[in-house]
């Protein structure tokens, strides 16, 4: 009996020490080197959110709350991660690595973090106009065509920074309207880097078992093929159709031929009936066709047929010609727009 108690006591001490080491590990493994972020205690963020009362939204790994940081009275969005032991810890580390050392006007800015015991929180700039999803699908005032084109360019330029302009190439892996936030000027910014993959300088592809959101993930995810930056291009293409048409990528309440947005867009493009996509909205035909062509190139099943995001930006800006795209699901065409 005494021996059993001694073993139990020793085991408890070892478990305690392991957990303490694990909690400190983020401080000691080089994760925060060269990252100029403010470290907050849980008590500070609890006070900033008034006990986490004002909920802004929920995601797969946690909940976002509105808060006010006393220093400077800055309004912020605070993401409190849940299921920290597994997925939450991974999301925390991914977001810290991905945007802790990046800055771009089309990326949501990360101000600080909390790594206090088992608590994992991230402090972001507050985006007063919510998500692009709410703006497109729930707002009484729908975006104008000018706003749609500006939003599309905002997001494309943010992805361009991640893929080609920041120190470490980043594949976001979860581009969708819910992860695009709008500031007070309706400027769109990319958020939620919990699934992001960082590539080494000599690396162009990666393997990962983690997938983004159904409907936005590129076909190569389903075949367990290498993931490249072209996966983000595919997701952007699906979202671009949602921006153009102001509807979800799948809507079971619509007629059968319109249920899957990407298929319907291609059918309308082939039939020369693009006006069906925007209904009563007044849009210049050439501008609408340009956006549709960009989207159709982005969603090609074959990754090599998709343009790099830099080319996507140029096409959206109207500075390069866009050839007629093949059927997105056709592997017969040898056309490339790279």
Kindly give the residue locations of the regions a language model identified.
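Conserved eukaryotic protein kinase-like
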Residues: 1-338
């Amino acid at each position: 009996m005494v021996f059993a108690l001694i073993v139990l006591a020793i085991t408890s001490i070892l478990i305690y020490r392991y957990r303490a080491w694990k909690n400190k590990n983020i401080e000691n493994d080089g994760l925060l080197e060269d990252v100029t972020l403010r470290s907050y205690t849980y008590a500070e963020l609890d006070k900033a959110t008034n006990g986490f009362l004002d909920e802004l939204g929920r995601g797969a790994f946690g909940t976002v709350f509105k808060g006010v940081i006393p220093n400077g009275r800055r309004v912020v969005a605070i993401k409190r991660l849940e299921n920290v032991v597994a997925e939450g810890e991974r999301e925390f580390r991914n977001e810290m690595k991905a945007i802790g050392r990046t800055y771009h006007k089309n990326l949501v800015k990360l101000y600080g973090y909390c790594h206090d015991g088992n608590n994992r929180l991230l402090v972001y700039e507050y985006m007063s106009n919510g998500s692009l999803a709410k703006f497109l699908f729930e707002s009484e005032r729908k975006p104008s065509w000018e706003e749609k084109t500006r939003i599309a360019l905002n997001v494309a330029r943010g992805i361009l920074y991640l893929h080609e302009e920041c120190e470490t190439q980043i594949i976001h892996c979860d581009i969708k309207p819910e992860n695009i936030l709008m500031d007070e000027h309706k400027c769109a910014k990319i958020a939620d880097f919990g699934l992001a993959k960082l590539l080494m300088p000599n690396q162009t592809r990666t393997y990962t078992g983690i997938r983004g959101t159904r409907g936005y993930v590129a076909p190569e995810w389903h075949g367990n093929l290498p993931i490249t930056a072209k996966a983000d291009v595919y997701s952007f293409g699906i979202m671009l159709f949602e921006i153009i048409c102001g509807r979800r990528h799948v809507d079971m309440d619509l007629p059968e031929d319109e249920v899957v947005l990407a298929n319907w867009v291609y059918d309308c493009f082939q039939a020369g009936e693009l006006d069906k996509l925007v209904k009563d909205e007044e849009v210049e035909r050439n501008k609408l066709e340009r956006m549709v062509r960009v989207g159709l190139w982005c969603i090609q099943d074959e990754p090599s047929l998709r343009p790099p995001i830099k080319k996507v930006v140029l096409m959206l800006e109207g500075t390069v010609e866009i050839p007629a795209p093949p059927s997105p699901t056709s592997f017969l065409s040898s056309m490339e727009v790279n």
